[in-house]
Amino acid sequence: MKIYYYHTRPIQEALDEWKNHLHPGHILYGLTHFSKHGIHPILHHYRHFASRIRFSLYNFFEIIRCKEPYDLLYGTSFYGLEFIIFLRAFGLYRKPIAIWHHQAVVRNSNKLKNLISRFYYRGIDQMFFFSQTLIEDSLKSGKVNAGQLHLIHWGADLDFYDYLRQHLPAANEEEPEKTYHYWERES
């Protein structure tokens, strides 16, 4: 399987840092494990924009112009994928979309916004959540169904931190560790 991997930051740099034990893998949302499962990612070319609309438009054109075939769009967030998701909801973007959703899907008090939002979520095929509570709260919105929501247990990259413990100099145990507070600056 080949996926288009979207992240809201420059990912190649972070992946290179991870390979050199300078960046924890859990921030890469599975990227470091995909190859073990036969998943081959195409990395999105990130570019920062202050405007969310310009950011979404840039991402839209980057994804649409991708020449390499892929089976699925995998996003670490929906932020910046809004145009693609709406196109999927309209049936104009054919690839399935799977994203991490970092908060519960909520119901809006404004009926028009709620209607638009319900349509928007039709453009997301699968969503990954960090807790069962977020899933349960999302189901209450009426915008998503249980079949598209998945609980993924996510935690620290223990291999990364074990490597740091083995390779960083040990603290001198005779001296007590000094705690610094932002209000106690040394001159």
Please annotate each region the language model reported.
Residues 41-59, 74-76:
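A short, charged, and often flexible helix/loop element on the N-terminal side
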Residues 139-140, 156-175:
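Acidic anion/phosphate-binding donor-loop and adjacent secondary structure
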Residues 4-6, 72-75, 89-107, 128:
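Active-site proximal beta-strand in glycosyltransferases
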Residues 60-80, 98:
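Short N-terminal targeting/anchoring amphipathic segment
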Residues 1-47, 68-70:
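N-terminal subdomain of nucleotide-sugar transferases
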